[in-house]
A protein has these predicted regions:
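Short beta-strand/helix segments in adaptor/scaffold domains that form protein-protein interfaces
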Residues: 1, 57-61, 66-71, 80-85, ...
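Gram-negative/organellar outer-membrane beta-barrel architecture
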Residues: 33-36, 105, 122-272
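Periplasmic POTRA and POTRA-like interaction domains that precede
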Residues: 2-53, 77-127, 149-185, 225-233
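Amphipathic, non-transmembrane alpha-helical segments in extracytoplasmic/periplasmic proteins
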Residues: 1, 53-74, 127-144
């Protein structure tokens, strides 16, 4: 204000001090223990409110939530009254969509069933990275990366999962020799990601003058949503055997054939 003075006017500044901070409340992300962060804030109860310190605390709050608890959140509302009460409302970022790129062979559902989150869920970086580790452990990919987009709605984001596939099929052939079976040829073929459905198929054939073996295997990692797996193996083995007759002078030759298989069911006990 201005007041008259000798030979002019004098300017009087009226200073209104900020209130003493009595209470700080956080809301919006229920699973985060904000009391832990309050201990390291510059703004503390019992002291005069410093606006610059408060803004610095709020800037660090978002990074702390993301680093310690994985959530992406923004400051949606901030209020402070003359009684020293500060209310901070946060808005968690939710998942608007999931985009999967780079999977030329692998079907989307093979990747999606390893994700523990879905559309509309609050984004948790720890949960996202844990799910992507499960995808990598499938053995179908060499590299996996993620990216979050900025949408028109600041409370939504789109997760893009970028994959680099590896070759999962193999085929080998060759010959072996033993004094019992003589010369034996073999052919083996397998695919760890059959038709891109995450199933495993393998076939083996061994053949020679005295021996013929055929094996076929199939493995389905998910026969239900809980991760129960099913494995089926079938085989046929035919081998020429010789038996010394009672006169100990002649050998009897016969072809022994065995058909069989096995069925296995499994359930995961841990994360990986």
């Amino acid at each position: 204000s201005f007041e008259p003075a000798i030979a002019g006017v004098q300017v009087v500044f009226h200073v209104v001090e900020n209130p003493i901070v009595r209470e700080i409340n956080f809301s919006g992300v229920a699973s985060v223990p904000f009391a832990e962060y309050q201990k390291q804030m510059k703004t503390q109860t019992g002291y005069i409110l410093n606006v610059h310190d408060l803004w610095e605390d709020l800037y660090g709050l978002r990074e702390w939530i993301a680093t310690e608890y994985g959530y992406l959140a923004r400051i949606a509302d901030l209020s402070a009254d003359t009684d020293g009460r500060i209310d901070v409302e946060l808005a968690p970022t939710t998942l608007k969509d999931i985009v999967i790129e780079g999977n030329e062979k692998t079907k989307d559902f093979v990747i999606e069933r390893e994700l523990s989150f879905g559309l509309g869920d609050p984004v948790n970086l720890h949960e996202v990275d844990q799910s992507l580790r499960r995808v990598l452990m499938l053995g179908f990919f060499d590299e996996i990366s993620r990216d979050f987009s900025e949408e028109d709605d600041p409370d939504e984001t789109v997760l893009t999962i970028d994959l680099t596939e590896r070759k999962t099929g193999s085929a080998t052939f060759g010959v072996s020799y033993s004094t019992q079976d003589r010369l034996v040829g073999f052919v083996e073929a397998a695919d760890e990601n059959f038709l891109g459905r995450g199933q495993r198929v393998n076939a083996t054939a061994r053949f020679g003058k005295k021996l013929q073996e055929y094996e076929l295997g199939f493995y389905e990692p998910y026969i239900d949503k809980t991760g129960t797996s099913l494995g089926i193996n079938l085989y046929r083995r035919s081998k020429q055997v010789q038996t010394l007759l009672k006169n100990h002078e002649e050998l009897s030759k016969a072809q022994r054939t065995t058909n069989g298989g096995d069925l296995t069911l499994g359930r995961p006990f841990g994360e990986f």
